[in-house]
Amino acid sequence: MGSLSFASETKKELTGIEVKPCCLKAELSALIRMNGSISFSNRRLLLNIQTENAAIARRIYTLLKKGYDVVVELLVRKKMRLKKNNVYIVRVVEGTHELLSDLKIMEEGFSFVHAISPELVQKKCCKRSYLRGAFLAGGSVNNPETSSYHLEIFSLYREHNESLCELMNTSFHLHARTLERKKGFITYLKEAEKIAEFLSVIGAHQALLRFEDVRIVRDMRNSVNRLVNCETANLNKTIGAALRQVENIRYIDETIGLDQLPEKLREIAKLRIAYQDVTLKELGEMVSGGKISKSGINHRLRKLDEIAERLRAGQPIDFHKSL
């Protein structure tokens, strides 16, 4: 995907999507509501839509020219602070009020509407387009290779943030949630499956494929790691038990001698000393007089552990109760 971030590549893909006439308003309304500002110059109402992404600026310019009879300029400024990126400004210099009214952003008397107008998102395709515009304007998504999955859309206004969340949940069941931030509000997704669904909803199919590819590999790697960790833990437990058993058997041998043990315990004790690395199942296959189950071998080894502990404590041992 080159040096661009996953979020940048996703947005680049979205700016190439063809928009149906009925969806143009929805996408443009989101882009302008979230990235636009108005000002007055020579008694004219100007609309400035600002972005640091050249492809998004071209997208806004194209949608405006395609859908409206307005006078539009495209300006480029250089940021002087921190990252000296270009800032692109799409400026509407004529027909601003009519445009904002048609996009349900401004009412009569220059009053702004922050919630999403139901009129703009009546069709499913228009709902998708509004969400696409919102993601282009204020969205970000973590690279799927990072430690946590996260997608969010930032909005300055609570009312817009809540209506955005409602649109995502009511129409597409995305389990989106909202959160207040220092300078505004976010609608966000944390579940990998829901992020994948959102990418599909807004038409980012190449990004979705990459996201799913990385997610499958990552989940597989996590499963393998969990399996290895589990196997390692079990192995460590088995080794620890075997070492304890050998130590106890040697203590019995040094204290009273293995010959004092009942025959069945004596045989297991000698086998465990001779074959310290084998499993209980393998020990069970080595005994004379037929195969013994793992639980049977484990029972005898526990009895040997008990005898060793009683010897250490100086307690009497009744070998008749040892089996």
From Swiss-Prot:
Pfam families: HTH_WhiA, LAGLIDADG_WhiA, WhiA_N
Biological process, per Gene Ontology: cell division; regulation of sporulation
Record feature DNA-binding region, as residue ranges: 279-313
GO-annotated molecular function: DNA binding
InterPro entries according to UniProt: Homing_endonucl, Sporu_reg_WhiA_N_dom, Sporulation_regulator_WhiA, Sporulation_regulator_WhiA_C, WhiA_LAGLIDADG_dom
Signal sequence, start to end: none
Record key words, sorted: Cell cycle, Cell division, DNA-binding
Similarity comment text for this entry: Belongs to the WhiA family.
PANTHER family assigned: CELL DIVISION PROTEIN WHIA-RELATED (PTHR37307:SF1)
Protein's UniProt name: Probable cell division protein WhiA
